[in-house]
Regions:
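Conserved Class I SAM-dependent methyltransferase catalytic core
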Residues: 2-59, 72, 76-77
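Class I S-adenosyl-L-methionine
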Residues: 40-169
């Protein structure tokens, strides 16, 4: 396909750095082997990855040569500490008692990391909520307008996670 070509990653990063503001994040989707190329092209800005579980596997034509693919990588890049607003979900078990502890330490750059506890409880602790995990499940859209189209709900999730209200996307 004409649209599915190798992009110039040096030019891509030059433009991303030009438009990235403050503690903004660059969030990209990829599949192997491009995932590895993308991370390697800017390891300094790479933060971590999520896994998007599509719930339905693809790749039936290659099923006799390799496993079906049911996930894509979501790669997060940024300069310094990026905005992160965890999208908590309702705990199906309801309110649970959890052991909490205080911790704080300095990272290699001398920044204080860890949660500042107030009265022994994390200031963002909600007993009936669960913090996100790196594997997120979103069904693919039934009638996509593009072969690589991502689900609207996945994009909303990422926008809510990596931006504050009224931020530019």
């Amino acid at each position: 396909c004409k649209w599915d070509g190798i992009i110039n990653l040096d030019l891509l990063w030059k433009q991303y750095k030009r438009i990235l503001k403050g503690n903004g994040a660059i969030v990209l989707t990829a599949s192997q082997p491009f995932t590895t190329k993308l991370i390697s092209s800017n390891y300094e800005m790479f933060k971590y990855e999520w896994i998007w579980d599509k719930l339905k596997p693809t790749g039936m034509l290659n099923a006799s040569h390799q496993p079906l693919r049911r996930h894509e990588n979501i790669l997060v890049f940024g300069i310094g500490k990026t905005i992160y607003n965890p999208q908590k979900i309702q705990n199906p078990k309801g309110v649970e008692k959890r052991s909490l502890y205080k911790y704080q330490r300095e990272n290699e750059g001398g920044e204080t990391v860890g949660e500042i506890k107030q009265g022994g409880v994390s200031k963002n602790y909600e007993a009936d909520k669960l913090l996100p995990i790196t594997i997120q499940q979103f069904s693919k859209d039934n009638k996509p307008q593009h072969p690589t189209q991502k689900p609207l709900e996945l994009m909303k999730y990422l926008i809510n996670t990596y931006t504050n209200e009224n931020d530019m996307v």
